[in-house]
Amino acid sequence: MKVRSSVKPICKDCKVIRRQRVVRVICKTPKHKQRQG
């Protein structure tokens, strides 16, 4: 899980979602998981 100020999809499988006002990227590649913080 990477914590960054700007989250962007890295590949075509990355999905940007909002969970309780936290922006997250979920992907089948574990390396691409991100959250905004």
UniProtKB/Swiss-Prot annotation:
State the Gene Ontology BP annotations.
translation
A Pfam family that this protein carries is Ribosomal_L36
- Ranges annotated as spanning the membrane: none
Origin: domain of life: Bacteria
A molecular function annotated in GO for this UniProt entry is: structural constituent of ribosome
Specify whether Ribosomal protein is a keyword of the entry. yes
Q: Which GO terms describe its cellular component?
A: cytoplasm; ribonucleoprotein complex; ribosome
Q: Please list the coiled coil stretches.
A: none
Q: Per UniProt, which keywords does this protein have?
A: Ribonucleoprotein, Ribosomal protein
InterPro entries per the UniProt record, alphabetical:
Ribosomal_bL36, Ribosomal_bL36_sp
Q: Does the keyword Translocase apply?
A: no
The similarity comment for this entry is:
Belongs to the bacterial ribosomal protein bL36 family.
Extract the NCBIfam families matched here: rpmJ_bact
- The name under which this protein is listed is Large ribosomal subunit protein bL36
